[in-house]
Amino acid sequence: MKSKVLALLIPALLAAGAAHAAEVYNKDGNKLDLYGKVDGLHYFSDNSAKDGDQSYARLGFKGETQINDQLTGYGQWEYNIQANNTESSKNQSWTRLAFAGLKFADYGSFDYGRNYGVMYDIEGWTDMLPEFGGDSYTNADNFMTGRANGVATYRNTDFFGLVNGLNFAVQYQGNNEGASNGQEGTNNGRDVRHENGDGWGLSTTYDLGMGFSAGAAYTSSDRTNDQVNHTAAGGDKADAWTAGLKYDANNIYLATMYSETRNMTPFGDSDYAVANKTQNFEVTAQYQFDFGLRPAVSFLMSKGRDLHAAGGADNPAGVDDKDLVKYADIGATYYFNKNMSTYVDYKINLLDEDDSFYAANGISTDDIVALGLVYQF
């Protein structure tokens, strides 16, 4: 009986994220759910910047209120707290998500705040590894590729109730920039890597049936003056597109995506290092056993083009094309029940450790093994 319950429950948890949240309040059209997790996590690596304790906790809530029979208000907040530093350490916690919105029956929903960019609608299909993954080109606060500030998002499910399985989203991001180099700046100025000008994006996904889905997304943003004048990528627009496929049925999960970015993707440890173009590929294959074990095999890569980057001793004139991310990943998660799990994730770095480009640009070529024990609710 336990195996059957796990077989039904675990895929639902993976798909819904906080679907197993604890209901705090549900009365008179008002509902509040609390969710969170504690991850006792340790990395093993020859890279001292990664090796060691990585433990953290996350806490969030989702709420909604029924305004009338056609209109619902909602909001979500999620916070991350690191647990691997001293109590006197600074900058060890941050807000991951914080947005509020309105849902208009079959006409869709609109929200504003800190939320996922629409590129992640497709990237999320392959970002399913136990610990690693989702990093060929997506980064938090890098335009609309991951979690981002100041995004207004309209989402529509089943195309106004007319086409089952056809979903789309339209998104606008306001500028977030520092006051320098002729920029007036905004009240939440940040370093050049995390700046962005005004931008927009759209995504669409379609459930093809029998477990198959297809999707695509596109974004285009203005770059700030700092980004145009003080990074290796000189274009005044940052663009990205992606397309993906997934299969999720019969305990099997398969997903793949391809994407390209222009004047957008940072690499290495220098604010100057932004690729003029990247070509990115991710694929993952997973199987959910009835007794709670979920093994996963994945491959991710990002090829940088026209980098104009330091090449190190091997390439004193600099380099233009180079792999920025390239690794295979073997992992497994075991679910004791819906609240407790443990996992191992082995990131096999395929970047050439003998290539001086990586040391010159602060890009690790070392493998990492992650071990985690998770309590979630």
Swiss-Prot record:
Keywords: Cell outer membrane, Ion transport, Membrane, Porin, Signal, Transmembrane, Transmembrane beta strand, Transport. Residues 175-189 have a biased composition (Polar residues). InterPro entries: Gram-neg_bact_OMP, Gram_neg_porin_domain, Porin_dom_sf, Porin_gammaproteobac, Porin_Gram-ve. Residues 175-196 are annotated as: Disordered. Its main location: membrane. GO terms for cellular component: cell outer membrane; membrane; pore complex. SUPFAM superfamilies: Porins. It is a multi-pass membrane protein. It is found in: Cell outer membrane. GO terms for biological process: carbohydrate transmembrane transport; monoatomic ion transmembrane transport. Belongs to the Gram-negative porin family. Forms pores that allow passive diffusion of small molecules across the outer membrane. Non-specific porin. This is Outer membrane porin N. It comes from Escherichia coli (strain K12). The lineage of its organism: Bacteria, Pseudomonadati, Pseudomonadota, Gammaproteobacteria, Enterobacterales. The gene is ompN.
